[in-house]
Design a protein with these regions (language model features):
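Structured segments of extracytoplasmic/periplasmic soluble domains
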Residues: 90-101, 126, 192, 196, ...
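Generic short beta-strand segments
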Residues: 55-62, 122-129, 165-168
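A structural "domain/chain start" motif
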Residues: 22-92, 198-218
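Bacterial N-terminal signal peptides that target proteins for export
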Residues: 1-9
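Short secondary-structure boundary motifs at beta->alpha junctions and helix caps
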Residues: 73-82, 151-207
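Surface-exposed patches in mature extracellular/periplasmic domains of secreted proteins
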Residues: 101-108, 205-209
Length: 218
């Protein structure tokens, strides 16, 4: 091993020890809420009467939700947001972008009477794990996986229509894991699921008058 590689290894170990010393309570809390990671399309003007009701998706557990693990620091990753509400928000946002007037319906509230379609379901998986990667372990990879089972009624959809959508998304941080990097991975996976969910809703005829878009390449 040459001198340059020795210096890099020593620096990496020093940073790792320093970061580990700053960890309190063996918990990493993710900041903020999920958001659309750059709109793929400009929002379109919603047509009158085209209201789509998106009910909060269900998710097992109680807040703050344990959604993953930082293996290098042996700590859990928690998020104070609600994955079911967050996914409903993202699906509604994608519908808005495509020209539908989407209304998110919180749990226990009535569906608007003028809704042309109703969307609901369960968040089956909402997880992100982080660990060091690479031959010298100088990078940290955060791998997120989100899975959603969606149901829909309305339009020309067949009875009991449902579909399961899953997406994985990876990000890398230099040297050590950060809450922002972990959140970016979760946001990427969640947005991909929301976009594909809307595509399938339109293709199945749950939402009348829509145009089916091909799934983006990954």
């Amino acid at each position: 091993m040459n001198r340059f590689r020795i210096v890099l290894v020593v620096l990496a170990l020093a940073v790792s020890v320093g970061v580990s010393g700053c960890v309190t309570g063996k918990v990493m809390t993710l900041p903020g809420n999920l958001a659309r990671s750059g709109m793929r399309e400009a929002p379109q003007t919603a047509a009158a009467g085209r209201v789509v009701a998106v009910l909060d998706f269900t998710f097992a557990g109680t807040p703050p939700y344990e959604i993953g693990r930082d293996f290098d620091h042996a700590r859990t990753i928690v998020w104070k947001g609600d994955p079911g509400e967050a996914m409903a928000d993202l699906v509604a946002d994608v519908l808005d972008e495509k020209g539908f007037r989407a209304v998110r319906v919180p749990s226990g509230e009535a569906v608007p009477g003028d809704a042309i379609a109703r969307v609901w379901g369960t968040v089956d998986k909402f997880r992100v794990d982080s660990r060091k990667s690479g031959s010298m372990r100088l990078k940290v990879e955060s791998a997120a996986s989100v899975s959603l089972t969606v149901y829909g009624t309305g339009g020309s959809a067949p009875p009991n229509w449902n579909s399961t959508v899953t997406s994985d998304f990876w990000t890398e941080d230099a040297l050590f894991v950060t809450p922002e990097g972990v959140r970016k991975a979760v946001t990427g996976a969640a947005n991909a699921v929301a976009e594909e969910t809307v595509r399938r809703l339109v293709a199945a005829g749950v939402i009348p008058g829509g145009k089916s878009h091909p799934a983006p390449g990954r």
